[in-house]
């Protein structure tokens, strides 16, 4: 099936170079030419074998559409075919995942082959310099830019574009790839090498499966040596639906860490991640990783995490409130969560906060393959009105409060019940992580604040002014991480 990748209705003749222009770019004849996303109508030439193939297939998502997030399709070369001398990519737009395009061209084209990119510049794309990033990605994958506009473009009206690149004779040191499901075992080997413990297939699926995340890898001599991953996070930014790319599983093989340069595998994968999945990003990096990323111009700090810890309180029942353990099998519980989430969202219309509806809580906590969390509603004993939700995890000696879903005014009551549960469970304390700009809401019930040396970055690689809107605006807790 052919998919419509353009966001603008244009005639194919407006954006395609002429057959004679393409023939002029052929390295040698006889030659093979692929019209990727175009038709062979009118393409007849001596000594040239011309084929056509769809650029992508309907619903073959490299980035699944969801709420505020637009879908991006995976480019797919024919499984069987020759090593083409020229590939003309028709109707290229942000609807096509550029790394899926270039990683296949890098593998399938012979040295000296030419790639011609054609299309119409989109109106108001998420990444304003989208086409520049597509070309830069091609260069990182081993292609040299021959002409920014394909020579004489007098016959091609603006905003149409043509970009011409040629594959280098020598392959780049690192092969860059969009991660696909079959790559999980090799990435797991890198994870073990870097972190010293394995990542299970189930945990990998929980993070990245079913369109929940994406990643970029760099390989050398067939082995994955770097990985830059992220999970999609639906957020409310000043009360409006948005999405951000939550960075996780940033890995570089120990033998490659000496190449921490602007052409090294870490920066290559991180830059591609920012250019494809930007401009809004965040994460919870280790201090050393944050320092390196700042020096390379990838990250800038927009906040940091702190810990608040409380002593247990009296275990007696509270006269005004009671507790209710939530269940995924009760629809009333789902509606309860969604209701208090709407109240919380209304209190945070001047902030940035990840969605905390039932669908999110179920996926984040109840679907986790290894950790056990308890989702507990605090309810008015007299009216039955839900006041908020606690997400708790019992540890060896304490209780972690990973998340709250509640209007701000209910936080003291929820924290009191969390302290009571710590006493009932025989734990010495209860604690939470919260962004420092929100900690004043938690300094109740005798809470004691300490720093945890975790900065919150924003992605500044693309120099997009939207990246700075998060400064001292995030509401993040330890449940927002992928590792707690």
What is each of the regions a protein language model found here?
Residues 11-31, 42:
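Conserved alpha-helix/loop element of class I SAM-dependent methyltransferases that forms part
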């Amino acid at each position: 099936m052919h998919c419509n990748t353009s966001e603008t209705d244009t005639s194919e003749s407006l954006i395609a170079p002429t057959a004679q222009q393409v023939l002029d770019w052929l390295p040698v004849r006889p030659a093979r030419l692929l019209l990727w996303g175009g038709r062979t109508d009118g393409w007849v030439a001596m000594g040239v074998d011309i084929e056509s193939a769809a650029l992508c297939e309907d619903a073959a998502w490299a980035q699944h559409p969801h709420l505020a997030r637009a879908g991006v399709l995976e480019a797919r070369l024919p499984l069987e075919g020759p090593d083409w001398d020229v590939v003309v990519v028709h109707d290229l737009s942000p609807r096509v995942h550029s790394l899926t395009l270039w990683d296949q061209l890098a593998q399938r084209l012979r040295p000296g082959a030419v790639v011609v990119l054609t299309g119409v510049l989109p109106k108001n794309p998420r990444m304003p310099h989208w086409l520049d990033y597509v070309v830069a990605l091609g260069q990182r994958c081993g292609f040299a830019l021959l002409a920014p506009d394909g020579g004489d473009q007098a016959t091609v009206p603006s905003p149409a574009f043509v970009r011409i690149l040629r594959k280098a004779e020598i392959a780049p040191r690192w092969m860059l790839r969009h991660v696909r499901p079959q790559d999980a075992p090799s990435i797991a080997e890198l994870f073990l090498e870097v972190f010293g413990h394995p990542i299970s297939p189930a945990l990998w699926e929980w993070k990245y499966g079913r369109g929940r995340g994406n990643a970029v890898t760099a390989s050398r001599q067939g082995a994955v040596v770097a990985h830059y991953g992220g999970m999609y996070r639906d957020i409310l930014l000043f009360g409006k639906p948005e999405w951000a790319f939550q960075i996780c599983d940033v890995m570089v093989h120990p033998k490659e860490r000496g190449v921490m340069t602007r052409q090294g595998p870490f920066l290559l994968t991180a830059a591609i991640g920012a250019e494809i999945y930007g401009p809004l990003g965040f994460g919870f990096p280790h201090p050393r990783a944050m320092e390196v990323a700042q020096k390379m111009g990838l990250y800038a700090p927009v906040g940091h995490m702190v810990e608040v810890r409380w002593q247990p309180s009296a275990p007696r029942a509270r006269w005004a409130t009671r507790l209710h353990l939530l269940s995924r099998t009760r629809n009333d519980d789902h509606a309860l969560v969604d209701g208090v989430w709407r109240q919380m969202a209304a209190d945070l219309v001047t902030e940035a906060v990840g969605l905390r509806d039932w669908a999110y809580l179920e996926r984040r906590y109840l679907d986790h393959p290894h950790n056990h969390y308890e989702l507990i509603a605090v309810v008015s004993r007299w009216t039955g009105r839900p006041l908020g939700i606690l997400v708790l995890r019992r540890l060896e000696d304490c209780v972690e409060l990973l998340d709250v879903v509640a209007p701000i005014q209910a936080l003291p009551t929820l924290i009191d019940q969390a302290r009571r549960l710590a006493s009932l469970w025989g734990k010495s304390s209860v604690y939470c992580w919260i962004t420092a700009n929100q900690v004043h809401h938690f300094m109740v019930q005798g809470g004691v604040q300490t720093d945890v040396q975790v900065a919150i970055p924003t992605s500044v690689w693309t120099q997009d002014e939207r990246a700075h809107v998060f400064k001292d605006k995030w509401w993040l807790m330890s449940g927002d991480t992928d590792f707690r």
